[in-house]
């Protein structure tokens, strides 16, 4: 019997999904007031995954009270054997923001925190189980505050051997992994309407996370510890957490956090559980 030829990759592929996190944490800082956040994402890939465009939405609870965070992204992903690059640009949009006002109408926040960021990410597949990465993100107008923001980080992800979980049914013993990130956010002086355009230094800070993930087909469960070296006072100066105006200028948005998440994702390249009879019900059989 002749070998059936593999179908060519589609010219345009798609990936989409949704996620729930017990706290939306962005580089160590809560964006949802330490509460849960529903999220969604969509990406189109072109020319076998070489180029992409995408969007994402995040439920937020921020001082300027936007309806959500809405992100747009575009870039390229060239690969060189075990090394892969992701070079792109992101735009963070916060629709229908409202300026937070204090007594007498004093400005406590800016009216617009939208900003653009340029990204360069590299990953190296050291072994079948270990992947290492380096990331650099740069914004010339971080949070619309006329400040430069540069975030650099290193990442590591390791797939745990399936035989470590031999007490589980064979179909579920694989898919466990641990991963971590260590980064530093370099921030310069900002000028905003809240300070009368007088420059003030945003606090640069160290950030790290480490977590355990479990992947079953298109479903990912993750529990992760996050922390920064920002003090509660620096956290307030950085975030403008509205409660800080009444508690002596402090915020808890940047401290220790253990966050859980569940993600559902599918794509035209790997439809996985969504393409099987019974769909998500297969998880419970």
Each model region followed by its residue ranges:
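Outer-membrane beta-barrel biogenesis signature
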Residues: 1-15, 26-31, 158-173, 269-285
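Short glycine/proline- and aromatic-enriched beta-strand/turn motifs that initiate or cap beta-hairpins
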Residues: 4-61, 267, 285
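Residues that define the transmembrane beta-barrel architecture of outer-membrane proteins
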Residues: 10-12, 34-38, 66-70, 83, ...
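Membrane-embedded beta-strand positions of outer-membrane beta-barrel proteins
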Residues: 16-18, 42, 51-55, 74, ...
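Transmembrane beta-strands of outer-membrane beta-barrel pores
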Residues: 20-26, 46-48, 55-61, 78-80, ...
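Outer-membrane beta-barrel translocator domains and adjoining extracellular loop/strand segments
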Residues: 26-33, 63-70, 97-109, 143-149, ...
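Repeated loop/turn-to-beta-strand initiation elements of outer-membrane beta-barrel proteins
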Residues: 48-53, 82-87, 128-134, 162-168, ...
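Outer-membrane beta-barrel "beta-signal"
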Residues: 154-160, 214-216, 250-285
